[in-house]
Each structure stands twice: as structure tokens, then as C-alpha cells.
Amino acid sequence: MVNPIATLLLECGAIEFGEFVLASGARSSYYIDIKAATTNPAVLTEIGKTIAEGREFEMVAGVAVGAVPIAVAVSLASGRPYAVVRKEGKDHGKAGTIIGDVLGKNVLLVEDVTTSGGSALYGLEALRAAGAHVDQVVTVVDREAGAREALAEKGASLLALVRVSELLDG
């Protein structure tokens, strides 16, 4: 396999082939356990470096909980601050949906796995509502099930470190 991130995901057990029943009840010939990658320091470090390289952004953000380790890894690799998009706002302490000052900043949104793009769209809208400029999303794995198109409709591009078709073809 040529894609070094795909190789790392396979080696750490984040991608398995076989017969699986997904949460939706659908059957799949592969399973993505991205937590096997994001809880592995060596793999997470490489993911962070790969995302940070050659991109222009002032801040990185991830939607809780899955994308937060990725946002931290990108922050450490780039030296730029990170923000967290909560799934639900809170009404005590520092209330709100966003942890971090994103107002007026060019924010790179990261995701662990994209399918239809629901989580990425939620993060995109929440960040924009908080005054951030967001036009790019980077995901570790894209299942190629509509996320790219959904984000494009909102004026954001999606870059995948690994596309499922690469894994199935390779």
C-alpha cells in the first residue's frame, strides 16, 4: 500500500476486513475502528504531522469527542492553538458550544471518519456561527458516502488522508 497513513491504520488494527454489522444494521465487508489509531501515540503523531504539513490555518478545531485527539495532534505538530466543538452547549461555567477563541480566525476543521458529513457539517456551522472562517475540512478516513458533496454545498472542501476506495482497491 502506497499511502503511509493507510498502512499505519491497517497495522494498528484501525481497519479490519471481514463481515460486520454496523450500528445502522447494515452489513459491511470492512470496519473502521479509528480509536485504535487515535489512542496510539505513534499513529496519532503521524496523523497530526500529515494534516499540519503545507496547510494555511490559524487554528485547528475538532468536534467532540472523536476528532479532539486529532485536533490536539495537529496543534502540537503545527504550534497553533486548537478549539473543541461540543456536541451540546452547556449552561454552566463557560457556557457555549465552542471551547477556544475562534472569532475572526481561519480555522481548519478536522474529523476522524466522515460518512455523510453530518458531524463535519455541525462543526462547520457551529464554528462559522462563532465567527470563524472555515472553508476546509480534513478527515483521516472518508467512507465516500456523501460528505464531500454535503460540505461543498456549504462552501467547504474535504480532504481525506485515506479514502475507503483506496483500501478496497488496494
Swiss-Prot record:
GO terms for biological process: 'de novo' UMP biosynthetic process; pyrimidine nucleobase biosynthetic process. This is Orotate phosphoribosyltransferase. Keywords: Glycosyltransferase, Magnesium, Pyrimidine biosynthesis, Transferase. Its EC number is 2.4.2.10. PANTHER family: OROTATE PHOSPHORIBOSYLTRANSFERASE, URIDINE 5'-MONOPHOSPHATE SYNTHASE. Catalyzes the transfer of a ribosyl phosphate group from 5-phosphoribose 1-diphosphate to orotate, leading to the formation of orotidine monophosphate (OMP). Its cofactor is Mg(2+). It catalyses: orotidine 5'-phosphate + diphosphate = orotate + 5-phospho-alpha-D-ribose 1-diphosphate. InterPro entries: OPRT (IPR023031), Or_phspho_trans_dom (IPR004467), PRibTrfase_dom (IPR000836), PRTase-like (IPR029057).
